[in-house]
Structures are given as structure tokens and as C-alpha cells.
């Protein structure tokens, strides 16, 4: 029997206008935006729907993305489409957990508001960097990085796309070594910090304090965790996995492979952009991939999959 997974993009996919048509057409979406704005004391409609200078700043991006993606999802569910399993890339993992039932929507939104602030300020500006390594096998990258201080793998996105992270000088030196070892390209990324590196541990420590005031709920469906690509069914594990995720590697390719092994053959990416849909095609061409980033797409996908 066919299994459907809802998957959620991470930071970098944000776009002005995300969720606006859902806000206009779905009372559920409208309620999430309005309640979230009150909960975090930000005008999230203005942040998501209007041109502004804040949307690309980490401390605002994260809360905006999770609010928009959850608002879209609740509308999709009201149309009759539901997931058997969820996962999200980095920030998207919070959406995955909320949709799986592990956190209420507002707790997820409040938590990522804090997470964004902590990550924005965890490392001094300019001290860290991230680069995408294209056209090189993960095992070769691991060999090149082995023994190097200050640089590690942030994301295993898909075959031929790995992201490295860490101290700025160490990332630059590793990039040169990777090109010499045969990488097709090494692209420095425009980011505000060395995400998913040990330099983010202070953010993880602060995040752990926030989780002390958050209730985790029994999961209604399983989700797959970034840090270990394992199927999670025990809500008692959520907090530790999310704290570790801030400074650990995101094993996205492995997470998708886990879901496929669990019988998922249909993936629905919910949120702005089609980043994960692109990764899916490189991980396994045999699975069905859909994207919902607009009301029109939601109607079409729900009609096809219900």
C-alpha cells in the first residue's frame, strides 16, 4: 500500500509571499498566522507577505518559515490529504515534528523563534563559513576532511551535493583541498553563521533551556530525525535530537532512504521553493515527488492523491 511523507525545507527556501494565498483562503491558515504573531510578538503576515529586510535574517527567517509551512499543512490536511510519515531538513524538522504530533504548532513556532536568535549570535560575525561541495562522493569528502581541525560536514543533501561548515579559514582550506581531490565545484554559501558545526554548540545549550518549558506529546505518526536518519516513534527522544541537530550533521539523503525503506513511495514537499524535490530526484528517481507552495498546487495535489 502506498505511503505518503510530508517533507519540509530548511532555511534558504524562504520567499516573500509564502503562505499569503493560504491566509486569504483558509481559516485554519489564518488562525495559525494570527496566533503565531501574538505568541512571538511579531507581525508574521508583514514578515512573510511584504518586501522587507528582515526575512533573510536568521532570527526572523526561522519563525517565518515554520509558521508559513505549518499554515500550509493544516490547510492541506483540511482538504483530506494526510501524511504517514514526516521529515524536514534542518529547520524543517520542527514542522515535521509538529505535523507528526510531537509538539503543538505554537510551541514549535515559539521554539524556532528562540532557535533563530541563538544561532544568529552563536558565533562572531565572519568567524565561520559554509560551502557546498558538488560532484564528489561523500566518502571522498570525509577522507579529505579526516584529521582537519575546524571543519566538518553540515549536510548530506543528495548524491553529488554535500555542504561543509566550520571556522572560516578551515572551510576555505578544505575547499581548496577538495577541488584538488577532484570536486567539480566548491561554492561558498551566503549564510550568517557556520550552521551544523561545533561552533553552534552554545546555541544548542541555550535551546536545551527553552525545551525545559516545552511539552512533548506522543507521536501520532513517525518522523525521521536529521541527526541519525532514524525513524522516531518515542517523543522522549525529540528534545535531545533537536539540541544535537544544531551542531551536528543533517543526514538528509539517508533520511529519505530510510523513509523509502519504510515503504514511502510518495513525497509531498510543503513550503516555498522546490529544493527537496530536486534532491529527491537525485536520491531515487522511482519515487513520486509533489510540491505544495501555493493554494493552487495544494488543490491540485490533494485532488490527485486523496
Task: Indicate residue ranges for each PLM-predicted region.
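Cys-dependent protein tyrosine phosphatase-like superfamily
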Residues: 1-5, 213-226, 231, 240, ...
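FabD-like malonyl-/acyl-CoA
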Residues: 2-140, 185, 189, 266-296
Amino acid at each position: 500500500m502506498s505511503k505518503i511523507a510530508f517533507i519540509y525545507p530548511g532555511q534558504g527556501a524562504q520567499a516573500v509571499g509564502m503562505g499569503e494565498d493560504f491566509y486569504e483562503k483558509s481559516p485554519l491558515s489564518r488562525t495559525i498566522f494570527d496566533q503565531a504573531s501574538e505568541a512571538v510578538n511579531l507581525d508574521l503576515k508583514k514578515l512573510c507577505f511584504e518586501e522587507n529586510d528582515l526575512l533573510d535574517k536568521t532570527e526572523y527567517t526561522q519563525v517565518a518559515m515554520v509558521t508559513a509551512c505549518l499554515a500550509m499543512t493544516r490547510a492541506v490536511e483540511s482538504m483530506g490529504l494526510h501524511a504517514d510519515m514526516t521529515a524536514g531538513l534542518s529547520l524543517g524538522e520542527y514542522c515535521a515534528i509538529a505535523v507528526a504530533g510531537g509538539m503543538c504548532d505554537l510551541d514549535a513556532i515559539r521554539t524556532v523563534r528562540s532557535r533563530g536568535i541563538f544561532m544568529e549570535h552563536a558565533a562572531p560575525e565572519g568567524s565561520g563559513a559554509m560551502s557546498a561541495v558538488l560532484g564528489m562522493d561523500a566518502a571522498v569528502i570525509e577522507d579529505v576532511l579526516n584529521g582537519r581541525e575546524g571543519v566538518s560536514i553540515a549536510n548530506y543533501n543528495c548524491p553529488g551535493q554535500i555542504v561543509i561548515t566550520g571556522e572560516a579559514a578551515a572551510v576555505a582550506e578544505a575547499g581548496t583541498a577538495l577541488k584538488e581531490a577532484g570536486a567539480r565545484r566548491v561554492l561558498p554559501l551566503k549564510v550568517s553563521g557556520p550552521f551544523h558545526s561545533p561552533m553552534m554548540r552554545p546555541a544548542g545549550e541555550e535551546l536545551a533551556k527553552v525545551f525545559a518549558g516545552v511539552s512533548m506529546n506522543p507521536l501520532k505518526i513517525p518522523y525521521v530525525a536529521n541527526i541519525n536518519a532514524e525513524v522516531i516513534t518515542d517523543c522522549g527522544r525529540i528534545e535531545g535530537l533537536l539540541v544535537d541537530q544544531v551542531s551536528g550533521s543533517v543526514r538528509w539523503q539517508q533520511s529519505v532512504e530510510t523513509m523509502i525503506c519504510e515503504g514511502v513511495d510518495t513525497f509531498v514537499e510543503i513550503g516555498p521553493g522546490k529544493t527537496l524535490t530536486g534532491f529527491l530526484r537525485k536520491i531515487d528517481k522511482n519515487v513520486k515527488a509533489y510540491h505544495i507552495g501555493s493554494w493552487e498546487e495544494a488543490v491540485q495535489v490533494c485532488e490527485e492523491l486523496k
